[in-house]
Amino acid sequence: MAVGKNKRLSKGKKGLKKRTQDPFSRKDEYSVKAPSTFAVRDVGKTLVNRTTGLKNANDSLKGRIFEVSLADLQNDEDHAFRKVKLRVDEVQGKNCLTNFHGLDFTSDKLRSLVRKWQTLIEANVTVKTTDDYLLRLFAIAFTKRRPNQIKKTTYARSSQIRAIRKKITEIIQREASTRTLAQLTKLIPEVIGREIEKSTHGIYPLQNVHIRKVKLLKSPKFDLGALLALHGESSTDDKGQKVEREFKEQVLESV
């Protein structure tokens, strides 16, 4: 056997593990901010890889969509079945400024609404807001018993369903086309549903009338000023003020 060569010593090196770097050490944390139309602005945190070379962290964040419960945004448990989608449009410092991207119902809520002995009426309307957002709103409604009704079933006739659907379309078109996206997001949860229920009472009594889904089809050209105004961070507030100082004439003492 050759001198200085020990096979037993060299065997141990095979079992050594490679050093694994923690993937979170290369990431930064950013705060997600909701528009000022909601009661709670802080949505949460999101992680992104740090800016390295040509890969910019801001570019990775822009376009991200977050799904948040409306109950958390409004501090109201009555809205727990509504899910709001927020899209990151701008990154300022460590804050991600978001805008409304859509709304949906939880599947368990939708399933709980559908029952026997009643008619389900659905309608969808494509509308354009005053600030050029193209949206598609999906409405859902159910028939209910009339006062002092003995009959178990509450089925509406085809002519009544058509009349109700026409009324729903008219109300949504009227409410959405005369408002901005920010104003419309305030009306969608409750106001439009109550308006439909009230106006269709003469055709057939309705219950559980909701805008179950809002889909954003097209957005206008990105406007940073409009987004900052939506977040209450308008650049006009940061302008400097002119300072007026009292002029004092210098008095020279005679020698």
UniProtKB/Swiss-Prot annotation:
Recorded superkingdom: Eukaryota
InterPro entries in UniProt: Ribosomal_eS1, Ribosomal_eS1_CS, Ribosomal_eS1_euk
Compositionally biased spans, kind Basic residues: 1-18
MF terms in GO: structural constituent of ribosome
Residues covered by region (Disordered): 1-28
Subcellular location: Cytoplasm
GO CC terms in record: cytosolic small ribosomal subunit
Chain intervals with Basic and acidic residues compositional bias: 19-28
Modified residues (N-acetylalanine): A2
Key word Electron transport present: no
Gene Ontology biological process terms, A to Z: translation
Keywords: Acetylation, Cytoplasm, Ribonucleoprotein, Ribosomal protein
Main localization, broad class: cytoplasm
Homology family: Belongs to the eukaryotic ribosomal protein eS1 family.
Subunit structure of this chain's protein: Component of the small ribosomal subunit. Mature ribosomes consist of a small (40S) and a large (60S) subunit. The 40S subunit contains about 33 different proteins and 1 molecule of RNA (18S). The 60S subunit contains about 49 different proteins and 3 molecules of RNA (25S, 5.8S and 5S).
Annotated protein name in UniProt: Small ribosomal subunit protein eS1
Species, as recorded: Ajellomyces capsulatus (strain G186AR / H82 / ATCC MYA-2454 / RMSCC 2432) (Darling's disease fungus)
